[in-house]
C-alpha cells in the first residue's frame, strides 16, 4: 500500500546479537503494540504474533531475524522483496491485489525486518480437508475461486517470452543451488551416496537423476511467462475467511515469493499440490524415518495422513484440466501437466534445506516436536523417491502417469 508506514527501529543491537524476542521487543516499542500471543501456523522461519495497537486495532506482526546461511526465500532480502512484489501488483493487477492482506507497517532494524498486517480471522486453504468428510468439495470450490483470481486477475495480465533454460534455472536450479546447505547438515553417508533405497525402491541420488533429465527439460518449458501473481501458493499462504457466511471468493493472500520477474503459473499450481502431498502433512504429523542394512530407508508420516488430503491429491490434476480459467491459458502449452509433476517433485526436494532454518516449534498431533533435521531428511527422501519414479516413467513411456506417481506419497507410504 502506498500509505503504509515505513520506519527504522532505533533500538541498539543487544550484546549477544539480535534474537527473535529482541527484535519483537524493538517492533512493539517502536509501534506501541501489545502482544497477545504467537501464531505458530506457517512454514517460514519468520515469527508471527497477534498484537493490538493503543487504539485497539488487531494486527499480525511478522518478524524475521534470518538464520546464518538461510536459503533463498528464507533470507532477509527475500522478506523485503515480498513487500515490493505486493506493491507492484497493486498497480499491475489491482483486482488480484485486493485479495492480498495490506501491509500496515514496515520496520527495518540492524539485520532484521518486520511488517504488520490487519489480523484476519481465518483458516488455511486445506482446513476443509481436515475438518469434514464432505470437505473435499468445499476445498475445490475454494480452490477454483483462488485459481480464477490468480490466473485471470493476476498471471494473465502480462505475457513474456520464456528464456532458454528456464526450467533448468528456475525449477531444477532452485534445488541444486540449495544442495550444499543440505550436504552440510544431513548425514554424510546419505549425501555422498550415489545410490540408495527408499521405501523398497532402488534410487539414484537426485542430482544424478537431474543430470539425466537435463535433455528433456526444454520439452516441458512454458509457452510463455506471465505476471508475478504470487510464486509461493502453499495452502498456508491462502487464508479463508472464518465468517460462517463466507463465500468461496472470501480469501486473502500473504507471503508471495518476493520476485517481480515474470513467472510461470504452473509453479504455484504445483506448490499447492506439494502442500497437500508432503509439506503440510509433514509439518502437522511429522516424519517417521527408519533405516536398515537390508531395506534401506523407510519414510512415512508418524500418523496416517488426512483422508481429505488423499482424495484431493487424486482429484487435483483432473480438476485443473477442467478449470475454465486454465483451459485458454494452456491451450498452446502441451507440456504443462508434465511440467507440473516435475515442479511438484522439485518442490519436495528444494523444501528439504528450507526446513533447516525452522525457528518455530512443529508439534505433531500428539504434541511431539519435529526437529528441523528430521523434516529436512523426510523431504529429501520422499523427493528422491519421486524424482526417480518420474525419470523412470519418462524413460519407459515418454510421459508420467500422475495417478501412479502421486500414489508413492499417498497410497504406498509405510505407517509411522
Q: Where would I find each of the regions flagged by the language model?
A:
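Short beta-strand micro-motifs within the conserved protein kinase catalytic domain, predominantly
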Residues: 99-113
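ATP-binding glycine-rich phosphate-binding loop
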Residues: 26-56
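ATP-binding glycine-rich loop module of kinase domains
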Residues: 45-83, 127-132
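Juxta-kinase regulatory segment immediately upstream of eukaryotic protein kinase catalytic domains
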Residues: 2-38
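Active-site acidic catalytic loop and adjacent metal/ATP-binding pocket
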Residues: 44-53, 211-265
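Active-site activation/catalytic loop segments of kinase-like enzymes and analogous catalytic loops
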Residues: 250, 257-326, 345-363
